[in-house]
Amino acid sequence: MENTETSDEFLYKMSSTLRKGLAEVQAKVNALYRVEELEEYIGVKDSPIEYIQAALAPLIGQVSDFQDYGETVTSRMTLNLEEVDVYAMLDSVMTIADQLLEQKSGVTLEEEIAEELPIIEADPLRLTQALLNLIHNAVKFTDKGFITVHIELEPENILFEVRDTGIGIAEENHELVFQPFQTILADKDDPRLGFGLGLKIVEHIVDLHDGESWFESEPGVGSSFFFTIPL
């Protein structure tokens, strides 16, 4: 038990340090955009600045996942609860989702949003993170068809669903889905291979809100990931 706690603490501190360092590098790269002599490189595909920017993005994302996971296992993750307008939150989520889909020309992003959703008490940043993690996961495993964000009002909850027409998940792999550092991919060189932390973080965020999370999936048909936030 003590070794596990020590490892979790190390993971949290390591990811925090890496995240800070990468953020400083990102700030320096952003500063280059304001240097007049470098204007010819801005927005040019494969230019040094754009290459660095593109390389930094997934690294920062992975390190952020590590830090968030470290917060879950060391009980550091807390919520800053406030009144949340789901429609306003969704506007920002869908803007980012559109950017995630820029390289997926065969995939259409759809919305199915209930009318007259009430204001809820939640952590808007964590709620946004949970929804974006599900969308990012759908984008990663969907090459054609649709990704649908569905939100509906239930008697005691708001139900969030991200549905895709991706590769789906075999039944024997269902138990791995919310486990950290697990993958459903057999090919260890698959570019979609990550650390398996995104869905675990979603589960923890939802748990902190006293909600529930689950999924349904069929190979070759697609997947639907759900979570609820109490009213």
Give the positions of each predicted feature:
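A conserved beta-strand-to-alpha-helix junction within the catalytic ATP-binding
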Residues: 80-95
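Glycine-rich G1-box
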Residues: 99, 167-168
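Short conserved segment of the HATPase_c
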Residues: 169-181
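Conserved catalytic submotifs in the C-terminal HATPase_c
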Residues: 73, 80-84, 104-118
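Short alpha-helical segment of the dimerization/phosphotransfer core of two-component systems
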Residues: 54-59
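Short helix-loop "hinge" at the ATP-lid/N-box region of the Bergerat-fold HATPase_c
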Residues: 138-139
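Conserved glycine-rich
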Residues: 210-211
